[in-house]
Amino acid sequence: MKNVLLASSLLIMFSGCAQKDKPEIMPKDIQIKTAMLAAPEDKKEGAMVYGYDEDGEVAVLREGTNNLVCLADSPYNKGISVSCYFNELDQFMKRGRELKKEGKETMEIRKIRGEEVTTGKLKMPEEPSMMYIFYGSEETYDKTQGTLGDGQFRYVIYTP
C-alpha cells in the first residue's frame, strides 16, 4: 500500500511539473492575427506566417503570396513580440531560431551568424532590408482577439 501511495504521489508531482514547462500555444487564427500587427498594411493579406504548432515547434501557419514573412509571438518569451521581414532575410532568421533552439545566447548567435555571413555560408540580401517589430506587455494582450493594447513599433534595417 505504501508503494502505491508513493508511486501515486510521485506521478502527481512529476505530471504537475511537466505541465508547468509547457507553454500556452494560441490557436492558429489568433497567432496569425497577432503576427499581422507588425505587417505593413499593403502586405498583410499575402504574408507568409510562421507560428507554433501544438508541440511548441515553429511551423508554417499560412503560406504567402508576396515577399513578406511574419513570425507569431513566441510562447517561450515574456511579453508579446511579433515581427515581419522580407523573404530575403528568411534564411538568416531561420538560422537564428536554430541557434536559439540549441541553447545559444543572443551575443553568441550574433557572432555565429556574423561569421557565417562573412564566410558566405549564410546569404544576406544584396540591398538593405527592413524588419518590422510590434511589441508590448502580456497584460494588455487580448488572447481572444489577437490585439495588443500598448503595442509599439520598432524597426531594424539589415544592410549588406
Report the location of each language-model feature:
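Positively charged n-region of N-terminal signal peptides that target proteins for export
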Residues: 1-4
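Short, linear, compositionally biased motifs with a strong N-terminal bias
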Residues: 10-11
